[in-house]
Amino acid sequence: MENNDKENNNNNIEQPVKKNRSKKFFWIIFLSAILASAIYVVYNLYLRPDNFLRQIYLVPKDAIYIIETGDPVKNWHKFSESKPWQYLKEQRKMEEINQKAHKLDSVLQANKTLLDLLGRRNLIIAACMTRKSDYDFLFIVDIQKTSKLESLKSQLENLFKANNFRVTKRNFKGEQIQELYDPLDRSTLYLAIIENHLICSYTGLLVEKSIMEKDDPIIGRDLYFLDVEQKVPDGGLCKIYINYRNLDGYLTLFTGVPDPDIQNIYRPLAYTGLRFKVSDNMLSLKGYTSLNDFTENSYLPALLRSGSHPVTVQKVLSNRTAFYVDMGFDDPVKFINNVEDVLQKDKEAYDAFKKNWDLIEKKLKIDIRENFLSWMSGEVAFAQYTLGLLDRQNEFVAVIKMKNKKDAVKNLNIIEESIRKHTPVKFKTIEYEGYEIHFLEMKGFFRLLFGKMFDKLNKPYYTIIEDYAVFSNSTATLLSMIEDYRLGQTLEKDKDFNQFMKEFNNRSTVFAYTNMRKFFPLIRNFVSASSWQNLQEDQNFVLCFPQTGFQLTGEKEMFDTRWFGEFDVLPAAEESDDEETEAETVDFVDREDVLQDLELFYLEKFQGNVYTEFYDDGSVKSKSEMSKGVKDGKYQAFYPNGKLLIDGKFKNNQRTGIWKYFTENGKTFRKEKWKNGQLKK
């Protein structure tokens, strides 16, 4: 019995020991598995060698532009809450973009996991053409070490399935592409993980192009791109890169047909890289632009090699300036020599240049370098004004800074005298308030030296204001500019302009300035009626940027590039009735106009004492013969379409004789007899 009890006691003791050993064994196995998993994760994330790929290597070679940001979520929120975006997104022109932006914002807000995945990850968005009439975006996110997790793809798949996407998979060039179909809008998002990057697009072709690009990248190894990328300043919301090689098709989407003039501007450019910033009152882009090897028949490479010059023409430009372009270089003769060097790469262009150069010198018996370029300081500007006091033509001026005023006047007189001798031009120099106005018939001269923009100056008049020679096709334009300068109404004395100019370099190679609220009404003269109607419907989109400026400053092999847009919304205008009654159209004949001295001078010297009034669109409203500043002689008034409305006479500013009134069909609907300003019955 005792032996049996001892055996039972021993058995009871052995059972707990076995259970304890089993538990220990289980925990050893479990902890070992956890440790092994941890070691595996640590090894994958931190110890296994990184085979990271540069993000830019996945951007297709046909990318039009590239947007890069280091903190996409935070920067998107900052931009979407800014005053410029809050205003612009409500404009009709931004309707489609705003819908896409709203969808992006909704996705980010609704998907915490996606937000955590992106976080402070570097994001590239590349815009690429998908067909001749459309383009789309490719998104590339650098997920860094997260890409080493084997479960990442399945986690993403589960995430999208949880959001009611239908997920399918296919292989392309050894890489797996996940296709995420959204049954709500029937769109498909294509997604792949390539090395350390997550790439996706709503166009599968772009994901495929990205996969093919990684083995033979083009943009990421392009020296012109790398030069720009290295110099773009840090900070801001994002960096923007423009690939000019692929710009033709993209711009045609908006213009309908290729524009050779626009193409000639960007043809010599390779890439522009810019840092983008936004505040409540300013949008800014700052960076660099590189030129390519194909620089034939372009002034930009010549300008790059020719240095820069301080921007100073605002001293004499009227505060009516709507738009102006300023070119600057160290030395004008050196600039022209550089132009010739560039043009020699294109024999046809160079031969045409030399032919026109020789023709002008032979016809006028002058030496262009000696008689024109020698006295220039190195700054040339072309400007367009709003309509002035004297006429309703488009007012253009060219302004040239003089190095030596005395030498400039001497050589301009030589050119003027040569023109008188060798052409049938008859123009007597006139003087207004101490400023002489001269005439030079030099067709094609300014375009030859400074490019197509100056082609508008065929037969210019000129005057001297301070240290600047000012040229224009219109004497009225010059007289108005002289008067503005005399009255101190110049850009230099415009506080808003001066504040805006602080954003730019003091020296410049090319500088373009636009006062959009002055420039927009002038566009009407250059577009069709239907185009003008469309522009008017979208005018708030551009008028909210009252001042914009673009600047290129040559620095060795690249241009320092800057663009700034001032943001300021106009207050809502009160509605008014623009309809004009027949009586109102007729009544302006009785207005007592008091002409200013400038108008009287212009009438006497240039208009044969005929005073002309204009409608807002520039068409003639009335013509009055004048004597000593009052209506005296024939008077005619016209409908806006140019048809005759009134035919009569004035004597000493009073109606006299028979007055006839006509319908737009040319029929007389009323006759009146006047004497000494009194209507006879």
Predicted region positions:
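Composition- and surface-driven signal marking solvent-exposed, interaction-prone regions
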Residues: 211-214, 288-290, 300-303, 338-340, ...
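N-terminal Lys/Arg-rich, disordered targeting/topogenic segments
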Residues: 1-23
